[in-house]
From Swiss-Prot:
GO CC term, one of those recorded: cytoplasm
Family: Belongs to the EPSP synthase family. MurA subfamily.
Positions of UDP-N-acetyl-alpha-D-glucosamine binding: R92, D305, V327
Gene: murA
Pathway: Cell wall biogenesis; peptidoglycan biosynthesis
Enzyme Commission no: 2.5.1.7
Positions where 2-(S-cysteinyl)pyruvic acid O-phosphothioketal occurs in the chain: C116
UniProt keyword annotations, A-Z: Cell cycle, Cell division, Cell shape, Cell wall biogenesis/degradation, Cytoplasm, Peptidoglycan synthesis, Pyruvate, Transferase
Protein source organism: Fervidobacterium nodosum (strain ATCC 35602 / DSM 5306 / Rt17-B1)
Protein name: UDP-N-acetylglucosamine 1-carboxyvinyltransferase
Principal location class: cytoplasm
Subcellular location: Cytoplasm
GO MF terms held by the record: UDP-N-acetylglucosamine 1-carboxyvinyltransferase activity
Length: 423
């Protein structure tokens, strides 16, 4: 596994945000629902995106990816309904092709998915939802098979937790099933709205995305379309926190500020200076910032994918803070690494208690998942001396041109390959 070497740097300047990874993946999966050409713009060049494209190709789809322009074109028939383990093991979002393939051609099978190791992330919500909309689910030697059955005229799927992946999976699958599907306690993330917009451009009838109740009125057939992916709010939040944690100032461009209201609320409480524009934000670190208490919750709450990064920022705050993780309750592998850098933190159940320190100190730390790795890079940039972050391949799953973007902001950063990133 490769490593990233960083030294103390004040981040400043401008950075442009890419299309959202967490939109690109379900949108690519939804393109399975038609044989006509679907064109996506602002597609980020990421290893996870490449994996999803490989999955589409293994089904028989024709996929063209212009990496320089960020354009993907998908068309053609599905000829293979089994997804290979080598692809599925890399990424959890791969599971979201099961329903669309089975809905279109009658059945599909896939091994259990992989992805970041950040605690329990069961697929039960997906499977129970698929059953509610008429699918027969069976298990055989570690593989899940979905077979299209008879759907009721009106199906209600209640999600015990507003799972983003399950909401997207059921929305897309139900789009070409007969009758009405109602998803209760649906996830409300902006990426859900983006998926609804794509599906409706393809001829679907989906309503309510962005609320806790989504209604899908099935249609017989979908068609091709063109669609531009929304900006990546998590990438934006990562660079914003990086600028502030290193006592810098900068402008983060190509964002939708309304998608980050929970972050603005937290940062303004700490004393950060935030100036929001129509599609950009200017941020400036105060000389001293203050601790605060954060509850990590499903959208519109504070996002779990920014929890590791905000811990770095709060570790250098004046005063104490608490961060309670209510989405992935064991997502704290990065805490031990931050403590090794001098942070004063302890975990009690699903809460991190933080007492701010004046400085962090560079050392060798290990990236454990995508967002934790990004957080450790930020910690290294804010720390005294040199920091080496090992096992960093995770970061290339979710941050396009991450080394170049940090460098443009003034970071002293270098990637040492130990196995080339899969992009």
């Amino acid at each position: 596994m490769g490593s990233i070497i960083v030294e103390r740097s004040k981040l400043s300047g401008e950075v442009e945000i890419s299309g959202a990874k967490n939109s690109a993946l379900p949108l690519l999966a939804a393109a399975l629902l038609t044989e006509e050409e679907v064109t996506l713009y602002k597609v980020p060049v990421l290893s996870d995106v490449e994996t999803m494209i490989d999955i589409l190709r293994t089904t028989g789809k024709d996929v063209f990816f212009d990496k320089h322009k960020g354009i993907v074109k998908i068309s053609g028939k599905i000829s293979i309904t089994h997804i290979q383990y080598e692809l599925v093991r890399k990424m959890r979002a791969s599971f979201n092709v099961l329903g669309p393939i089975a809905a279109l051609v009658g059945e599909a099978s896939t091994p259990l998915p992989g992805g970041c190791a950040i605690g329990a992330r069961p697929v039960d919500f997906h499977l129970e939802g698929l059953k509610k909309i008429g699918f027969e689910i069976s298990f055989d030697h570690g593989e899940i098979r979905a077979k299209r059955g008879k759907k009721e005229e009106e199906s209600v799927v209640y999600l015990p937790f507003p799972s983003v992946g399950a909401t997207e999976h059921i929305m897309s699958t139900a789009a070409i099933l007969p009758g009405k599907t109602i998803i209760e306690n649906a996830a409300m993330e902006p990426e859900i709205i983006d998926l609804q917009n794509l599906l409706n451009k393809m001829g679907a009838k989906v309503y309510g995305a962005g609320t806790s109740k989504i209604i899908v009125e099935g249609v017989e057939k979908l068609h091709g379309c063109e669609h531009t992916i929304i900006p990546d709010r998590i990438e934006a939040g990562t660079y914003i926190i990086g600028i502030l944690a290193t006592k810098g100032e900068g402008i983060v461009k190509n964002i939708i500020p309304e998608h980050l209201e929970a972050l603005w609320f937290v940062l303004e409480k700490t004393g950060a200076i935030i100036k929001k524009g129509e599609n950009e934000v200017e941020v400036k670190s105060p000389d001293k910032w203050y601790g605060c208490d954060i509850n990590v919750l499903p959208y519109p709450g504070f996002p779990t994918d920014l929890q590791p990064q905000i811990l770095v920022y709060l570790s250098l705050a004046d005063g104490s803070s608490t961060v309670t993780e209510n989405v992935f309750k064991t997502r704290f592998a990065h805490v031990a690494e931050l403590v090794r850098m001098g942070a004063n933190m302890k975990i009690i159940e699903n809460t991190v208690f933080i007492n701010g320190v004046e400085k962090l100190y560079g050392t060798t730390v290990m990236g454990t998942d995508l967002r934790a790795t990004a957080a450790l890079v930020i910690a290294g940039l804010a720390a005294e001396d040199r920091t080496e972050v090992t096992s960093v391949e995770h970061i290339f799953r979710g941050y396009e041109n991450v080394i170049e973007k940090f460098s443009k902001l003034g970071a002293s950063i270098k990637y040492i390959p130990g196995g080339v990133p899969e992009i």
